[in-house]
Amino acid sequence: MVKATHRPLITASQIHGQNAAKVVPQKINGNLLGSISKRKHVMIALPCMKAAVTTPIATLMCDCVLEGLKPGGKWVYSFRIINDYFPTEYARNVLCRHFLESDAEYMWFIDSDTMPDANSFKLFDVDADIVAGVYPIGRQERGNRVLAVDWGMYNKSPEHENGWLALPLEAYQNGEVIDVDAVATGCMVIKRKVIEHFAKTAERDSDGTPAIFFWPKIATGKSICSDDFDFCKRAKAAGFDIKVHTSVRWGHLKFKDMRDVYEQLKSAWMAGYDEASEEGGYTALKDTLELEDNVVRPQ
């Protein structure tokens, strides 16, 4: 597991440059400061790769700063950003440790390759132990259209593959809040009591990082399910409720390792193998796409 530096706090001016500082009050009066101290504290937990996030995330973070400064508001937001911790479930555990060391009441996991929408703050209208928005996980091509086939919300279903049924978003067109058995972690708000519950019995690293998120495996080393499925299964078993606000619909950038792309294209080429084109086809494909340790990252 790779450890790297973390940045404890990002301000509006750091996100959008010095121009953002103009819309943040330079002085906060005593009444406003007092009201902020009474607000519910949300820690935004953001695991990054190569210190990169999407532009909509940067915009959301700036909006959080401004939202927390509004007179009469209910929420105040802080940020914990860690960079290049791997694997992702370990990054989440490090963020859980920072959360437990803070006075925050809610942790909001945001994956760095997601694209928040204007409805993001509606998550805090829902009183649930765990509440999430949706974003496309899987896709399929249909004619000239690319459709999301999996929106990261699931119910148990023994008759379906792996025992889970992906719920169709088109069934919820009125912004319904629904109960589910599992959600993806990339846009997930968790109450403090949930993290504290699992931290009590979690194994810990030498720095105190609790193993709350992990990929359970069988003796052969094969994974049983992903870390978010496992976390949700344990949360439901412990009596916590999980909800989805279906009007919070984010985008999702799926990044591909170019070596995987090369293997896919190689297979496609071999399927249509033509002896006469071997020299000009496969060689050019290999030279173009076989990039050692070259991974596509968010820009």
Where in the sequence are the language-model features?
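C-terminal catalytic/acceptor-binding lobe
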Residues: 2-30, 37-38, 197-299
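N-proximal low-complexity "stem/linker" segments adjacent to membrane-targeting elements
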Residues: 2-85
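Alpha-helical elements of Rossmann-like donor-binding domains used by nucleotide-donor carbohydrate transfer enzymes
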Residues: 60-63, 94, 122-123, 230
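A short, glycine-/small-residue-rich helix N-cap motif at loop->alpha-helix starts
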Residues: 86-91
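Active-site nucleotide-sugar/metal-binding loop of Leloir-type enzymes
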Residues: 93-106
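Conserved catalytic core of nucleotide-sugar-dependent glycosyltransferases
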Residues: 96, 117-216
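Short beta-strand-to-loop acidic/aromatic patch adjacent to the donor-nucleotide binding site
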Residues: 104-115
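Short, Asp-centered acidic motifs that coordinate Mg2+ and/or phosphate
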Residues: 106, 130, 242
